[in-house]
Amino acid sequence: MDTREVRKIDISRWKDQYIDFLYTSNDGLRLYFQRYKRTWDETEICMVNTETGDVKVLIHEEDKPYLDYQMRAIHFLNDGNEILFRSERTGWGHYYLYDKDGNLKNQVTSGPWVAGPIQKIDTAKRQIYFVGLGKEKNIDPYYYVLYRADLDKKDAVTLLTPENASHDVAIAPSSRYFVDSYSRVDLEPVN
């Protein structure tokens, strides 16, 4: 693949679009990018075949009035053979697992609550650890709590920090344990 050849690739779709380059496969044959419409209400995750220059749209997303850029999450698993993508297509932020061709494999989380930022992905166990908001009836919906979900099962979500407080968690590289510091306005930090 190391030909040092410069190849111009047409990645234009919308006038004044915004481009984020996301990932390159280990073999260098696939390049992934995300493009946004200037109005920020439409986006596409695309893959470029670096040998041919062909661009393929894998995921197309629209959200009115606009996409929430700050909560955006795209993770490439197993060298780009799977894509974990966060979407608000149902009105709630949730995670979706796609194959390398953009076919939906599983909606990992769902329901009337928000799946927030990912804290860790364990590809060996096929699990994600993420912040959730508003899922538990007895926990203030503004508090960050930690959940674990299985990538291959729909709604296999487990609450890991059940205290009614906002949690700040550090997860061990092995995913076997985590350190939790939680607090709220009327509760000093507990570790």
Positions of predicted regions on the chain:
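Peripheral, non-catalytic segments that deliver or gate enzyme domains
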Residues: M1-N191
